[in-house]
Amino acid sequence: MAWLSADIELIKKYRKLCNQFKGGAMCGRYYVDDETAKEIEKIVRSVDEQLKKEAARDIHPTECAPVLVASGGDLRCEVKRWGMPGFMDKQLVINAKSESAMDKKMFCEAVEHRRLVIPAAGFYEWNRQKEKSTFTRKDSPVLYMAGIYSKYEDGDRFVILTTAANESMEPVHDRMPLILEKEEILPWLTEGRKTGEFLGKVPCQLNRTTEFEQLTLF
């Protein structure tokens, strides 16, 4: 597997943005933590003590976040903003359905030419009773969400691809992020002929923790 190009300036930029941005739709918030940073660091093959110490934070729409993109035959870590402007005034689009993205004017070119991966420690979802659940991988501290991005005057913006919920997600929502395995990252980014196959995949089963389960007196 090719690896991320070490780019200290991008890492510094991400650290600066993390300090700047503190902080209905499916997967409207996700989060990164020190394990996410460590995983990115492994792929980048660079050691940056400040990134290791990056405080856990939630990523909200309109904020900037680290993503993985293809760079030649390798991978690269960049910082892009979450959410694309919609066709209606002040509309923000943060997700795209994997089943129909290739047929949508807004997304089809990005699906073909500008795919990316969003690393996260987990993501949140709320049910109809407004109860919050946290979803994480069972076998890894980091999950990789498939996404696409487009270029705008104010910089690159991305959306998270979603698919039908699997058994672990169905009790809370009928949609979930399109989650990739680590070994699928490079093929998703570089092998266009496999795009349709990836868009139709069923994500792995996830751990779910409800908000009341996260509360403790100790």
Explain the meaning of each model-derived region.
Residues 2-218:
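Short linear sequence motif anchored by a di-proline
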